Amino acid sequence: FREFGLDWDWNVDLYGKLLAVTGGKERIRYYVESFNTDYVKPDNFDELVASLHKTKTRHYTEMLSGGRIPVRPGVRRLLDEARKAGLRLAIATTTTPDNVTALLKYSLAEDAESWFEIIAAGDIVPAKKPAPDIYFWTLEKMNLSPADCIAFEDSENGLKSSLAAGIQTLITTNDYTADHEFPGAIAILSDLGEPGNA
C-alpha cells in the first residue's frame, strides 16, 4: 500500500477478517467499504484496485521465488501419488492465473502446470466462491460428475462452493481457519501429512 501512498495496514487479525471475501480485488473493495469508510474513492478507483492487486501479485511471486512461502505439508506427496495413480487433477480457485502459475512453479516444479488437466482461476466465471460456478465450469470442461470427484479446500467459502456443486470435500485448515467449523466436510485436517513425520 505504501507504494501507492496509502496508509492502509492489513495486520494479521484484519486480514483474517478480510478472508471472508474471496478474490483479491473484491477483498480490497470490501476493506474500503467495511473497514476504511472514511476513504474517499478516486474516480479511477477500479484501476487503483487492479493496480494494487497486480502489485500484490508481484510481491507474492517474489516471495515464492525466494523460497519464503513453503508448500503445505503433504501437498507435493499427495499430488505425486495422484499422478502415479493416473488420477485426473484440476484446480478451481478464485485467485488469479498469475498467482496460480507462480505458486505451482516455485512451490512444486517448473512444469507443475502440466500436472493439471484444467486450471480454472480468477475471473473465468462471474460469481466467485462461495458460489459453485468455478466448480461447475471445471466439471463441465472435464466432463465429470460431482460424485466422481473430491475437492480439497481450506476455507468456509471454498467448502460452501464445492458442496453446492455436489462435490465431497476434505478441509485442510490454516492459521486463519483452524478454529472454524466446516459442516459438511468429509474430513477436517491440519495438513495432508508426510509419512514418517509425526
Language-model features: locations:
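Glycine-centered flexibility sites
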Residues: 21-24, 74, 86, 122, ...
